[in-house]
Amino acid sequence: MKKCWTIPPAANAAFAAAMEDVLAVYHRPFDPTRPVVCMDEKPYQLLGHVRDPLPARPGRDRREDNEYVRSGTCSIFCWVEPLRGWRRVDAQPRRTRVDWAHQVEHLLTVDYPDAATVVLVMDNLNTHTTASLYEAFDPAKAFALAQRLEIHHTPKHGSWLNVAEIELSALTRQCLDRRLDDLAVLNAELAAWQQQTNSNQRQVDWHFTTDDARVKLRHLYPTTQRN
């Protein structure tokens, strides 16, 4: 038996530096002019039924045939402002640099048009850079959007530091526990989950601090070399 796990590197200065940077961001006070937003994305396989499922009835769960039809793949984008209890999720056919850039444009012009700066926490996927903005928009617009971002990357093998990844896990359990074979249907389900979750304004109160990390995760820090 085995489990797949994200194992951080031991005694790694780059990991420790990025981890402490993100932890410091999470402990900033709430500031609507500089909201802290986390983002993540995940691939999703659209699946259809070969045979109609048998509905649940007293004493018997719903039954699905183990054979299915692949209906393509897509990517689910998730944006979370932990201190406000706000989420935005939607699925797109692709996850290219241009797709990410248009997601950022929506974030800055629709979700946060009045924020001076959006503090963005995400992993260091190659599409997650301001260079992607220049592939999607003219230089003036790309520069203007980039100037409103303050980007902080989680360390490699440190996905547990991304609140948006935690939210995607919750979304998967609560909303994606059955087969969906159409992008429009998937987006309708995501919109319903988003509306319900946002109406509850469930905030994320991050307790783990840099002081905690230096004690509980001290094996991740390199040995200090002093002259």
PLM region spans:
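Extended, low-complexity cationic-aromatic segments
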Residues: 19-105, 217
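C-terminal domain-tail junction helix/linker
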Residues: 11, 50, 185-227
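Active-site proximal helix-loop segment of RNase H-like, two-metal nucleases, encompassing DDE(D)
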Residues: 87, 164-183, 196-200
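Acidic/histidine-rich, metal-coordinating catalytic segments
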Residues: 115-129
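RNase H-like two-metal-ion nuclease catalytic core shared by retroviral integrases
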Residues: 74, 123-124, 151-173, 184, ...
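RNase H-like polynucleotidyl transferase catalytic core
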Residues: 63-68, 141-163, 180-181
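Short, basic/hydrophobic alpha-helical segments
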Residues: 98-119
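Mobile genetic element proteins and their domesticated derivatives, centered on retroelements
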Residues: 38-40, 79, 85, 104, ...
